[in-house]
Amino acid sequence: MEEAYRQARKRGEQGRRRAISQSEYPYLTDLDSLVAQLPLGQRENVGLRDIPLEMVVGTVTKGRQSAFSCNFMPLLPFGTEFARKWSNLYDIQVTEGYRDPIIVTEFMHRFYVQEGNKRVSVLKFLDAPTVSAKVTRLYPGTWDSVESRLYGEFCAFWRVCPLYEIEFSREGSYETLAKMLGQNLIEKWPQKKVDYLRHTFLLFKRAYLCAGGDHLDITPADAMLVYLNVYNQDRLLDTPTDIVVNRLCKIWRELVIAGKNDEDKVDLVEAPSVDEEKAPAKSTSGVLNFFMGKTVYSAANPLRIAFIHEFPCATSSWDSLHDQGRQYLDEHFGGIVRTEAFEDCHDPDVFYAAVETAVKHGANVIFSTSHRLMEYTLRAAVEYPRVRFLNCSIGLPHQSVRSYFGKMYEAKFLLGALAASMADNHRIGYHASVFASGALSEINAFAIGASLLDPRAQVILTWGDVPAGGLAEAMCREGVSVMTGADMSKSLEDPTAYGLHRLVDGKVTGIAMPVWNWGRYYELIVRSLLHGTWDETSDDNQVRAVNYWYGMSSGVIDIRYAPGLPYQTRKLVQLLRNGIVEGSINPFGGELHSQNGVVQIEGFPPLPSTQIVEMNWLADNVVGTIPQLDDEPKVPAL
């Protein structure tokens, strides 16, 4: 008894000194002082609950603050009445256990003790995981901060799945977790599902701490979401801890990125290096090796690249264009680069089989050409760390997979201006089939371009797939004479259902279309590999995701006019295009207005690129709404 108290007091002194050395408060926090200047909401009697002891962080009042260190260990000398009572409670706990619950107030996902401070101290000394408590929840008075919104999401989660242990630091994570488990935040979860999540989380947390996760700036629940995005959760309970630890080590950089602020997660590479722009084009011998720097490839030792397409190239124009880019590499680099393609890999098993085959064939680089393949690509990249993986997407913060996409908003800005110059009634249609990263910047750039030519222009926004031949019907229904569809036809059977069109006498006629030059894009990326500048793009000491985001100035994006377009119109659009390429025109510079008000005032510089990628608003001349994201696909294990 005496020895236990002396050890506990020693821990208390250590905790107190450590807090002082780190300029932190060395005693227990009291809730009364914490909320004295804060607006508070209602109280709710939650009832009798088992709560995690690690979340018990202070007292309700100041009364016993100085008797405990900030780690809840005792500070008063042995021989005091306090020490005697603490020791008696210790004896009861180790011989028969406590019968009565403590009384606590919950505030912002932390607990403050009203009755039972010494019992909490004893249990923490014994490393007990939980304590029985009568809980009263105190709600904040406002919900306008990130912390309060996160707590609101936790409360919604807790009502359907009463687990205190699950704590996230990113908004939206509770909903993501619910979707992964086939649940939602509205209907109460079956008890079996609650128990399953509790056991799964505790198993994962144990492995996470064994791997050194307590040194990261994320919670164990944050880390579990990252893990489940890569590895299947169905067998997690049956997976030995050492295997989970090994997997965590493989995705460690993904965990590090998860702990960064959004603005620090991604490096946007917006232009190729000078070497990539001006590199020698083609060689079939070792002459080019002189120029290769760190990375040496030749016809005898080629750079092998695999392309994995979501659908067959014969039926998908998107995949067909990417495959044309692949073929361009074979021709352009004359044997120094050799490629192979895998089509119709939207099924995860087919995708992973394609990766395995490509690796067996000696692939150094693997491109997956759809953003919907990113999760499969991430899983494969973790399994094959020596292979470089890239996915055609933007704004996704994965260190193991580089992303690449084009500044399509630049082309849409030009198409918007062109549309306004030809619309009869100030109404212009915009049909978007997919809500993905970058989609809103394209819509807004189109709307801003239209407003430059016609301040009264309205952009009528619709979403979803359009059946073959359905564009004209959609235009009539919306009362518009000019409309832009998808960047390209989803099916080669309907080649007119994309780009900017005009409805004349019931017939759809093309005006212009955006153009992807994937051959040029792949050439620039491959040059970075051939010249050894790939690794110079990112700093190994700063773990960040790398996203290539090239535009018109790099030659990867352009527009193509339909025959017969008036030369005056072409001249106007060409002037705007030159401004985009030279950098003197940016659709997101200066005064900007959204449907909800002013985004920025006149004279402001263009929005930062990260804000353009992550745009979450619609321009004030857009008539439409932002849809809710569909459920993300689950990624089966390899």
Name every feature range the model reports, one short phrase each.
Residues V382-F405:
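Flexible loop/hinge segments that line or gate small-molecule binding clefts
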Residues I305-Q324, L329, F342-P348, A436-L440:
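Extracytoplasmic "Venus flytrap"
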Residues F107-M108, Q114-L177:
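Glycine- and acidic-residue-rich phosphate-binding/metal-coordinating active-site segment common to enzymes
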Residues M1-K118, K124-F125, R170-Q183, P190, ...:
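Short, charged/polar connector segments at secondary-structure boundaries
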Residues H531-T537, N541-L638:
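Segments of small-molecule ligand-sensing domains
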Residues R326, L414-A457, D540-P563:
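An alpha-beta-alpha
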Residues G362-H371, L390-C392, V480-S489, V508-W516, ...:
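Periplasmic-binding protein-like
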Residues Y404-H426, V515-E536:
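Hydrophobic alpha-helical segments within soluble ligand-binding/sensing domains
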